Amino acid sequence: MGTFRTYTLKIQGNDITLKNITIENNSARLGQAVALHTEGDRLVFVGCRFIGHQDTVYTGMAGTRLYFKDCYICGTTDFIFGPSTAWFEGCTIESLINSYVTAASTPQDQAFGYEPMSHWRLSKLPWHHPHCDYSRKKLK
């Protein structure tokens, strides 16, 4: 089936806000299982829960901007991945196994990748597994 066709929810529009919703991909831990697949700019997620195993949240297009506030994201391997710029404020990120949390594929000409902001809570390390030479992440 392939990673990019396993999503529970795919967003292809711009300027969309989701609040207090749970998006879960409950397929078995046998491969990729995307809960959220984004292909829009200026997407906002507030108080949402994203639950899956490998590849839970796909930040799917270079040059797009995503903002996660007070969200819960859990998974197993590289469960936040893709080329978008994404800010995470007050989010709880839970790794269900001792593996990499993110796999950014930030393009060389894009200034930012994944940006944890204030009140960042990460349950386990390691944080970042780059998917290309220019992957960017920032820890505060």
Residue map of PLM features:
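Sequence-level preference for short, compositionally simple segments enriched
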Residues: 1-140
